[in-house]
């Protein structure tokens, strides 16, 4: 019998694998790699939290650190067991971060680059908000833009509506030509002179200053409506030359039309139908030169209204009678 002080063989068998496991080099390397991996993850998480704490403004910091515990406490059921080691470590890290933030706030050494970045973000976000305004606000702005300029009443609005119905690439050309047509008479259009010659270092203002006053006003209104006046100097010059060349070509075509006249585009009216003429054509088709010539075996007297030929067999009408 086994003595009571002697360990049981089962306990000895349980100790041997554990000792062999901890003495094994592969298990040690695996544990070391896992430990290094966990330390690396902990370091990265701490860096992320520090970046969030320094980059975000002070108003958003309490919401980050206070809102998650509230949601967890309200949703989680009451538990009787003690908190695990991971929870204790997370609480320690959060408390340490809070204390670090308090000390930084008290010393006044917070990084100001984060606030500058947020201000730039808010400034950049305010610009698209102005672009993505409601239709009423855009209509009010368009009315302000359309009201400017010494043009006939409603001319700019009609030009904008006509340009909106065309392709996007041709909208500025259509807009400018429509305003010019309503602002200039045909006699004035004959004497229009548009200069496209540019010199080295010339700007759009210099080029438009050498044009006629009405041409200059039309081009300036077009560039203002399509916000081309906010472009660079070279881009403004190219856009102004584009509009001027289009106006010059259209003025040439319009002057040629006024001088030579426009051909009549209306198709001539069809003459009324003559019933006698229709019957004559129908009889000509039934005559010897018509279908009769195509069918030579058909006797001519059938077409001419004569009697039937004896070669055609006669059909007894009594065959189609039905006895009552």
From Swiss-Prot:
GO biological process: lateral inhibition; negative regulation of transcription by RNA polymerase II; positive regulation of Notch signaling pathway; regulation of cell fate specification; regulation of development, heterochronic; regulation of mesodermal cell fate specification
Gene null: resulting phenotype: RNAi-mediated knockdown suppresses the hermaphrodite gonadal development and egg-laying defects in a lin-12 mutant background.
Alphabetized UniProt keyword annotations: Nucleus, Transcription, Transcription regulation
Domain of life the protein comes from: Eukaryota
Tissue: Widely expressed, including in pharyngeal muscle cells and body wall muscle cells.
Composition-biased stretches (Basic and acidic residues): 134-146
Biased composition (Polar residues): 67-85, 124-133
GO molecular function: identical protein binding; sequence-specific DNA binding
Residue stretches of biased makeup (Low complexity): 86-98
Complexes and interactors: Multimer. May interact with mediator complex subunit mdt-29.
Identification of the protein by name: Putative transcription factor sel-7
